[in-house]
Amino acid sequence: MMRFMLLFSRQGKLRLQKWYLATSDKERKKMVRELMQVVLARKPKMCSFLEWRDLKVVYKRYASLYFCCAIEGQDNELITLELIHRYVELLDKYFGSVCELDIIFNFEKAYFILDEFLMGGDVQDTSKKSVLKAIEQADLLQEEDESPRSVLEEMGLA
């Protein structure tokens, strides 16, 4: 099971974090700071897997963002690397060509896509099409809620 997922920039700015195990805020901040230092200090040619505390850390850099997952000891690192890649593919499909600014200004969509893809640290749906369809339906529903309607339409009389 995945314990948490972090997205951070090369400058060490946290852009997204998702925790799948209850952890205090103080401990989270400490873990994020430590892990960012470890990952950012590594050379590009080094392996994307590392042992850290009692966890395995799998990370991948895409452009200026690091996607970093902490998994339990018995979990498969290659599957986790593929999950990171699938998440990036979903972000790319939704945003066009995703960049750090898309994550910054549309963080709620990035979280929503992650929640459609992963639930409780485990894969919920591996199909890109079904995840993107669910996101598209949610967008349509949100657009309907935000569109101005008359009083008669609100009452179902129009």
Curated annotation (Swiss-Prot):
It comes from Homo sapiens. Widely expressed. Gene3D superfamilies: 3.30.450.60. One of its GO terms (biological process) is retrograde transport, endosome to Golgi. Keywords: Coated pit, Cytoplasmic vesicle, Deafness, Golgi apparatus, Ichthyosis, Intellectual disability, Membrane, Neuropathy, Phosphoprotein, Protein transport, Transport. The modification Phosphoserine is found at S147. This is AP-1 complex subunit sigma-1A. Subunit of clathrin-associated adaptor protein complex 1 that plays a role in protein sorting in the late-Golgi/trans-Golgi network (TGN) and/or endosomes. The AP complexes mediate both the recruitment of clathrin to membranes and the recognition of sorting signals within the cytosolic tails of transmembrane cargo molecules. GO terms for cellular component: AP-1 adaptor complex; clathrin-coated pit; cytoplasmic vesicle membrane; cytosol; early endosome; Golgi apparatus; Golgi membrane; intracellular membrane-bounded organelle. It is a peripheral membrane protein. GO terms for molecular function: clathrin adaptor activity. It comes from the Eukaryota. It is found in: Golgi apparatus; Cytoplasmic vesicle membrane; Membrane, Clathrin-coated pit. Induction: Up-regulated in response to enterovirus 71 (EV71) infection. It is linked to MEDNIK syndrome: A disorder characterized by erythematous skin lesions and hyperkeratosis, severe psychomotor retardation, peripheral neuropathy, sensorineural hearing loss, together with elevated very-long-chain fatty acids and severe congenital diarrhea. Adaptor protein complex 1 (AP-1) is a heterotetramer composed of two large adaptins (gamma-type subunit AP1G1 and beta-type subunit AP1B1), a medium adaptin (mu-type subunit AP1M1 or AP1M2) and a small adaptin (sigma-type subunit AP1S1 or AP1S2 or AP1S3).
